[in-house]
């Protein structure tokens, strides 16, 4: 369960801006802090290249 950043991430920073928990940083590509992430999926909605996948399986 969680957010997965795919290899095609270009580090645009949209996910960082829109994450309500401030759980994402960019260091060339996006990195998710799983301790802060609530798995809401807002970051994925704002990714212009669909490089973020939300795993909702239990």
UniProtKB/Swiss-Prot annotation:
Cofactor dependency: [4Fe-4S] cluster
Cross-referenced Gene3D superfamilies: 3.30.70.20
Pfam families, alphabetized: Fer4
MF-aspect GO terms: 4 iron, 4 sulfur cluster binding; metal ion binding; oxidoreductase activity
InterPro entries recorded: 4Fe4S_Fe-S-bd, 4Fe4S_Fe_S_CS, Fe-S_Ferredoxin
Keyword RNA-binding tagged: no
Reported function: Ferredoxins are iron-sulfur proteins that transfer electrons probably in the CO-dehydrogenase complex.
Name of the protein this chain belongs to: Uncharacterized ferredoxin MJ0624
Species for this entry: Methanocaldococcus jannaschii (strain ATCC 43067 / DSM 2661 / JAL-1 / JCM 10045 / NBRC 100440) (Methanococcus jannaschii)
Phylogenetic placement of the source organism: Archaea, Methanobacteriati, Methanobacteriota, Methanomada group, Methanococci
């Amino acid at each position: 369960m969680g957010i997965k950043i795919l290899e095609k991430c270009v580090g645009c920073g949209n996910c960082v801006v829109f994450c309500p928990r401030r759980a994402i940083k960019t260091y060339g590509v996006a990195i998710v802090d799983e301790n802060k992430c609530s798995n809401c999926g807002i970051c994925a909605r704002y990714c212009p290249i669909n490089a973020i996948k939300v795993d909702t399986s239990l």
